[in-house]
Amino acid sequence: MKVLKFGGSSVANSENIKKVLAIVSAASKETKIAVIVSAFGKTTDNLLAGANNALQDIDIAKQQIETIKKLHFEIINELIQTNTLEVYEKVNSLFNRLLSIYEGIFLLQELSDKTLAKVSSFGEKLSSFIIANAAKELFDTT
C-alpha cells in the first residue's frame, strides 16, 4: 500500500486538485493507495482567524465563513457535475456547524486550544469530502 499526502498548495484550487487526482489515478493502477489531503490553501489560517475574530465581533467571523464558503463552492462548481446537491448540502451543514462554534466563542468569550483544534479540523473535513466526491465522479467506470 502506498500513502499519498497532498498539502494545502497542492489542493489550493480546482486546477491543482485535477493534477492531484491525475496522480492518484496513475498511482492506483500500480498498487492500493490511501490519500490524505490538507485543507484548501490558506483555509486553516482563515478558519483560525475567524475563531479569533469571533471573540470580538461575530459579524466579522461570519464574513470570514462566507469567504471560505465561496472558495469551496467555486471548487465544487468546477470539479463536480453529478450529485452536486448532496455535496452542497453536506458542505453547508459543515459550515453551519462551524458558525455554531463561532457563535459559542462569541457568547462565552472563550477560545480554548480544544476549540481551536476543532475549528481547524473543518478545513480537512471540507477538502477531503469535496475531493472524494470529485474522485468518485472522475474514477466512476460504470
Residue ranges and their predicted role:
Residues 1-142:
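Nucleotide/pyrophosphate-binding catalytic subdomain
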